[in-house]
Each structure stands twice: as C-alpha cells, then as structure tokens.
Amino acid sequence: MSGGDLGIEGISVSENQDLILAHGANSGIFLIDSNSPENNSHIEWSGDYSLLDSSFHPGGKTAIMVGEGGNVLRMTLANSSIEQAGGPSTFGDTLLTSVSWNGDGSWAYIGGEDGWIWRFRGTSDGGIEAIVLENRGDRVISGISCLRGHNICAITSTLGGIGIIDQEHGLHWIGGFGTPWVDIVCHSSEVPECIAISSDLTIASIVVVVSEPSETRVFDNDIVQLQGFVGAMTGIEAQSDGISLISLAPFGLIEHDKEAGRSFHWLDNIDAVEFDVEISDQRIVGTWGSGFFEGWLITDRGTLVSFGPVDQNEGDSMLEIWIGVIILGGATLLVASLMVSSSPKLSNWLTKRIGSEEERKDVLRKERVQSRKKGRA
C-alpha cells in the first residue's frame, strides 16, 4: 500500500479473524494481517470505481466486494486473484452499498440504492445467479449482517426501517421506520441479537426470533437515542463477547455492550484532537479486535491506529492510550499519550510492547528487583 489519501471506504474481517480486506476509491483493494498490520499488500485491479462493502465467505476461501456501477468482484484468497463476478448487465447502474453472506454461505445478499436487494451466488458452470427480493422498499440499503449458524440476516434502510431476511429469502420489515439508519451488526450468541445504528446517535437492539424470523419486532423501548455523545454514527463492528465498537464522525468511538444494554465513551473527538490533529481530521472506516479491549482502526486515508486501555476499571471503558500508528506503505510511528510520563505502570507496559530490545530488558530487570523486594517484605 502506498502513502497518501487511499480513499478507503470499507473493510471486512475473515472468518478466522486473521485477515482484513480493505477497499475503496479507484477499485483500491488491500489485504492486511489483522494482528500485524504492517504486513499488508495492495491487490492489483484495473477498475476505476469505488468499492463500498465486502464480505468473506464462511468457507474462508473467497470474498466478494460491491460498489459503484453495479460492480461485484470476487477475490480468491489462495492466490489473491480478483475476477469480475457481476456488473451492469446484472445490476444495472445501481450503486451497490452493502453485502453479506448468509450463515452457511449458500447465498450472499447485496443491497443498493433505491431499496434494491438481491440474493446472489456463483453457479457450477462459472456463471452467477442474482434474484431480486420481493417486498423491497425504496430507500438505500445501508447495512446487511447475517447470523452465523442460521440463514437469517438483518438489514437497515436509510429512513426505510429495519428488516429481517428469513431462511426462505423472505424480507420482513419489522420497525424503526423514519430513522436514518447507517449500519447493523449481528452477534451470533446464545441469544441472537443485532444492533442497528443511525447517524443521529440512535441505537436499536433487535432480538431475532430464530424459530420464526418474521415474528421479530423492533419495539419503541428497543430504540434509544444516546445522550452525552457528540457526532454522527458512521459504522459498527462486532469485537467479541457481545461488544461492538461504533465509529463516529468527527473522529471518535463508542463501545456498545449488548449484554448490559449500555453504551460507553471509548474515544471522544477532543481527546483525538489533543493526540494528533491530522489523524483526528480523518474518517474512521472500520475497527477490529486483536485482544482483550485491544485492537486496530483504519481511516479513509489508510492510516492504521492501534489502541488499548491503560486499565479496565469496572464501568470505565474510556480509551486512554494509543500505542502505535502505521502509515500504510510508510514508516511505523510509535506514539503514546502524555499519560505515559505520569504512570510508571503504563510506561512499563508500553515499553514491553513497543520499546527496543534493550528497553524491554531494562523494564524486566526492574520488575524482577521489585518482585524480590516485595517477597522479602
């Protein structure tokens, strides 16, 4: 990946969580190692259109991307090859905005402007099959997310409401009408639940009735407009154990805990500005976890930022420290907040993670000395 403004528009995470597929302007396609993002590659493709969304197949061997002009691409992960999997002859000139494979990978659902939504798959003879779903609306399909283990998916439509797609590809509108929904993510936990977000800081929690998806409903008390937060929600990604991170514009993050039914400040824009004015002016495109309350985010310009908390006190989920920035295709910049100078514990933790070999050895020696002193006390 080269430096500069890459125009990243979206990401997806592979089934085994080891790969990130990023894509955007001018058919830019990038593969990133989720745990070591400095290992990344630009995948060549000659298109000149924006790729807005993507989804890995549950089988882990391919991924599809959708975007402008009705274009659909398929990537084969074994050799990182790209092929055209659909175009204007199938989807017209429709702006394709969202895509997700269903639970067993038998069909993908592709959504676009004007409420268009198709079920899509490749055929054994190398062709494709794309069938328009009945009962579609007339507003852009802003998000699609599917439950693993069930061939049930949830969709959001900007001002058009929230819908459920059942095992027979029936589309059922279940509520949330008139809200500017921008994205949705489903957690395939013991109680299957999807979280929808809107640009006006509204969150909807949808408990899916797996036995009869059409009976799923979004009630008034399932929808909450957050107070005390600033910005517009732009995207949501599942992290782990019912935790999601919600991206904000301007640059910020909210943690949502579906088990607790609560949302928490994770990173406020004012903190991001104090950290780095240039980075805070960028748009967060996606996030993924790499450990307990640790992970990465990627911006529209292709900047990757590693994050993790100083300490996780009960009820305190505020992001308090940045531990690294990677400018894709350029140098790695190791940075930390001013809190380092006033917190020996944090300083040592950071040194062990990102310090030089000699610095790490020095910290370990000091910790061993302190441990022996405590043992003699």
Placement of each model-derived feature along the sequence:
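Residue-level hotspots at or immediately adjacent to binding/recognition sites across diverse folds
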Residues: 1-377
